[in-house]
Amino acid sequence: DQAVLDALKKGVEVKAFAAALKNLKAAGIATYVYLLFGTPAESPEAARRTLSFVVAHATEIGFLNLAIFNLPAHGPKMEGIASGTFYTGDLPLYRPFVHPLGWDRKEVRCFLEKEFKKEPAIAAILRRDPPFFTSNHAPFFVMASD
């Protein structure tokens, strides 16, 4: 979603991703798309716009990796984010946080399982992922199917 990318200061435009997917597909290069859900700037509506983008470009996406945002324990402070520790003495990589838009991890996970992954075009992409798969291996699976 463009508003999420802008809020997170990513410096990229969704239309550039669309063009890249199209051009990579035309060149015969497989894509492994990593999507991060539940960032502080994302709402359920924004996530649904991401779902629509993936559906619109499903024929150009080789593989998908879906992840849920974790707030880094020692990353930059994010304004308006209430965070804490998991327990006294904990040495975590991540901090628990209260999503500023009320979209907590449980709701994000529910959206992914009950809505995002249920979309037929997306489910077809997810079924292509081998059980032990990383983005480093994507080209080999595409080459094997040629």
What are these regions (language model features)?
Residues 1-146:
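A structural motif corresponding to the C-terminal lobe/cap of the Radical SAM core domain
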